Curated annotation (Swiss-Prot):
Subunit structure, interactors included: Monomer.
Amino-acid positions noted as binding substrate in the UniProt annotation, renumbered to this chain: 66, 111-115, 175, 180, 240-241
Top EC class, one word: oxidoreductase
Primary localisation category: membrane
Active-site feature positions: 178 (nucleophile)
Family per record: Belongs to the dihydroorotate dehydrogenase family. Type 2 subfamily.
Protein name: Dihydroorotate dehydrogenase (quinone)
Cofactor note: Binds 1 FMN per subunit.
Subcellular location: Cell membrane
Binding site residues for FMN: 62-66, 86, 142, 175, 211, 239, 261, 289, 310-311
Organism this protein belongs to: Thermus thermophilus (strain ATCC 27634 / DSM 579 / HB8)
Gene name linked to the record: pyrD
Length: 346
């Protein structure tokens, strides 16, 4: 099946796979047997972050299941949490196609999707239904603004989406760092970000996090850290996709959009280590270029409380979460580490 999907157009393959996973998710009893085979349940993997309990530190990054259609499947496949979105207050179709490209030679993707989603209201209905069914998977909700909303009114979009979705998420992420919505990254800059966080922080008692770009300078990252602390955010998600294109081999390398996957690995780890130096009181969620158990181990050791995957999962297939978590346990045993909290304190 994995090989068949790679023979299709990338967005068509994503739509087909997600549709099948959504059908599977709607049939709860059918999730139990594969979950017993695929999930790695071990108390050494448990994580407490921003007041939420996670069965393991490996999560599905935003973008894979924008509209919260396949939540049961992510649990059955072994993830410790899933982040839905990016969700905007109103539905939008996103950018023109083609807008998703596989860079197989680089184990990477380029996307310029443009926050295509069915809107916060429909996602809220799906999330409510999953909660009513007793889904045991912690869910993050990634929020954005509609493309046609001026930057000066961006906070209103984030507030509208947050109010619709607030009862159903375990934590919320403000996406101000996608390169595929014109002008959005300006919201990472001091005055815009200060105003945005001042509006959003009082609107929820749930954990609120900020997703940052990999292309920020150390000085800009320090400014983000300072504002996150000023407004009492619970954490940062680092990093989003990059505009950089150094060293790529694929013929798709010059396509516009955000690059994810293996080429982002070094920069994602560099940003994580920089943030960890000044992140007192903030939980860090690392994402970008995670492909192996050693990658997962390195992110946790560098200060991440949680780690997300997207492109690695696309290339690695349905057994990918299990392989990473079993490999992480082997590394913990080899190093004499009995819990992830102990690893981060090392």
């Amino acid at each position: 099946m994995h090989r068949f999907l790679f023979a299709l157009d990338p967005e068509a393959a994503h739509g087909l796979a997600l549709g099948l996973l959504a059908l599977w998710s709607e049939r709860g009893p059918l999730l139990e047997v594969p979950a017993r085979l695929l999930r790695v349940e071990d108390p050494r993997l448990r994580v407490e972050a921003f007041g939420v309990s996670f069965p393991n530190p490996l999560g599905l990054a935003a973008g894979m299941d924008k509209d919260a259609r396949a939540l049961g499947a992510w649990w059955a496949l072994g993830f410790g949490f899933a982040e839905v979105g990016t969700l905007t207050p109103r539905p939008q179709v996103g950018n023109p196609k083609p807008r998703l490209f596989r860079l197989v030679e680089d184990r990477a993707l380029i996307n310029r999707m443009g926050f295509n989603n069915r809107g916060a209201e429909e996602a809220a209905r799906r999330l409510k239904r999953s909660r009513q069914r007793g889904l045991p998977l912690p869910i993050g909700v990634n929020l954005g603004k509609n493309r046609d909303t001026p930057l000066g009114r961006a906070a209103e979009d984030y507030l509208k989406a947050l109010r619709l979705l607030e009862p159903f998420g375990d934590y919320f992420v403000l996406n101000v760092s996608s390169p595929n919505t014109p002008g959005l990254r300006a919201l990472q800059e001091g005055p815009f970000l200060d105003e945005l966080l001042a509006r959003l922080r009082p609107a929820t008692k749930k954990p609120l996090l900020l997703k940052v770009a990999p292309d920020l300078s150390p000085k800009a990252l320090d400014e983000v850290l300072a504002l996150a602390k000023k407004h009492r955010l619970q954490g940062l998600v680092a990093v989003n996709t990059t505009l950089a294109r150094e060293g790529l081999k694929s013929p798709w390398a010059k396509e516009a959009g955000g690059l994810s996957g293996r080429p982002l690995k070094g920069r994602a780890l560099e940003v994580l280590r920089h943030l960890a130096e000044g992140a007192e009181g903030l939980a860090l969620v690392s994402v970008g270029g995670v492909e192996t158990p050693l990658d997962l181990w390195e992110r946790l050791k560098a200060g991440a409380s949680l780690v997300q995957v997207y492109t690695g999962f696309v290339y690695g297939g349905p057994l990918f979460p299990r392989r990473l978590l079993l490999g992480l346990l082997r590394l913990m045993e080899a190093e004499g580490v009995s819990s992830l909290g102990e690893l981060r304190r090392a």
